[in-house]
C-alpha cells in the first residue's frame, strides 16, 4: 500500500539514528487507514481506500513531549488542506484530575484555530500495570475537542489494556470505542515484516479516522456534524453502560451506512450553525400528533467545539 502513503520524517533529529522498530507502529496504523478491511474482512466498513500523509514525530520508546508538541504544531500549520488528523501516541502517566495536559491543551488550540479535528487513541495500560486496577487516560487523550477512541475486544467489552476517564471530572473521555484487539482476537495489520496481528487503542482509532474522513471529505459534512453523527450512532437508544468511563458513549457501528442512515421507524434532523453570545434560535419541527399526543421518543446529540484556554481550566 506504499503508493497510498506520502511519508515525511524531516522533523526527526537525524542524530538520533534509525531503528527498524521506529517504522513498525506507523506502518501498522497506516495499513488500517489506507485499507484496513483488506486485512480484516469482518470489519469491512464501506468507506473504500484513503490516501495518507504520514508525519513521523516520535521514535520508538520515550520521546520529548516538547519536541513532539513543536512538531505537531508546525505540521498542522503547514498542511492546512488536511482536516482529519489521526494521532496514535500517548503518555504512560495518568492525566491530572484537575487540569488539562499541555499536550491536550495544544490540540484544542489547533482545532479551534485551524478548524481541524484530531482522532486520538485512548492510551493503553503498560505491561507493568495490573489489568484489574483502574488507570486514567494519559495525554493527549484529555483533549476536550478531540474524538478520543478506546478499544474493545471481539466480545464488545472494554479491552483488558484500556484506560478510563473522565477528564476534569465531567468531560466524558473516551468519547467512543471500537474493536482494537484483545486476548480473544487481535487486529491484522501490515508491518515492515509483512502481515502481523496486534492490539491496542492505536489500532481502534484509525477505523474511526476512516469513518470521520469519509463523512468530511466524501459526504462533505462539517467536522461538527461528522463528530455528532459518529457519537449518535455509538450511543443508540440503550441506557448508558456502567462501563461508560471506558467505552465512552458507546461502540461505533462497523458499516458507514449505519452512521449515515436510519431505520424506517426513525427520523433524524441535523441542525447546525454558529451561535454567538446571547443569541437564541427556535426551530419548528413538524411532527404528527395522535389523540392529542406525540407518540414518539426523542433524543438529542449535541456537539460543539468550544474555545479552550488552559489558564481558565480547560
Where are these regions (language model features)?
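C-terminal subdomain of the subtilisin-like protease fold in secreted/lumenal serine endopeptidases
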Residues: 219-295
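Short beta-strand segments enriched in hydrophobic/aromatic residues
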Residues: 89-91, 122, 152-153, 302-306
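A short beta-strand element within beta-rich, extracytoplasmic domains
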Residues: 294-313
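Flexible loop/turn segments at secondary-structure boundaries
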Residues: 61-62, 92-96, 126-129, 155-157, ...
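Substrate-binding/access-modulating region of protease and related hydrolase catalytic domains
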Residues: 57-139, 197-199, 203-204
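Extracellular S/T/G-rich loop segment that most often corresponds to the catalytic His/Ser-adjacent loop
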Residues: 1, 135-213
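Subtilisin-like serine protease catalytic core
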Residues: 1-11, 15-65, 115, 143-145, ...
